[in-house]
Amino acid sequence: MTARRVVATGTFDILHPGHVYYLTESRKLGDELWVIVARDENVKHKPRPILPEAQRLAMVSALRPVDHAILGDHTDMFCPIDDIRPAVITIGFNQYFDEEKLKGQLAERNLPAEVVRIGKYEDGDLASSRMIVQRIVEARGSGDQRIG
């Protein structure tokens, strides 16, 4: 029997509980969780990653819910999905994907994957990389050496 594969994608810059929640919830949808980590040069919809792609990949690979982690393709985001052939593709609550458009693009490539948007992580006030960076800047900018 073929394993039910789930693909999750993201930048995963400065890992935080929101990322772990997204990947944990994604893993519940199948037998194997494959994570595609965005390449540095492909992150265009938000500030460039602070951590280089190899380091982000290593961090994601070390997380318990993750069975396989790979870097995305340099030019075509669907190439790894063509190879993995997932049953499900998950999208984070704040990822810039139109689910219907994505379903259409998958259908054009004969990839009948279900598309599922994972909800927002609600526990804690530092559940985004942006908020973590902001807290660090505020703490260091004020001369306070503590972060917390």
Swiss-Prot record:
Pfam families given in the database record: CTP_transf_like
Binding-site residues for ATP, renumbered to this chain: T11, F12, H16, P17, G18, H19, N94, Y121
Keywords in alphabetical order: ATP-binding, FAD, Flavoprotein, FMN, Nucleotide-binding, Nucleotidyltransferase, Transferase
Annotated catalysed reactions: FMN + ATP + H(+) = FAD + diphosphate
Pathway: Cofactor biosynthesis; FAD biosynthesis; FAD from FMN: step 1/1
EC numbers on record: 2.7.7.2
GO biological process, one term: FAD biosynthetic process
Cofactor(s) required for function per UniProt: a divalent metal cation
Function in brief: Catalyzes the transfer of the AMP portion of ATP to flavin mononucleotide (FMN) to produce flavin adenine dinucleotide (FAD) coenzyme.
Complex and partners: Homodimer.
Record-stated family: Belongs to the archaeal FAD synthase family.
Name under which the protein is recorded: FAD synthase
Gene from which this protein is expressed: ribL
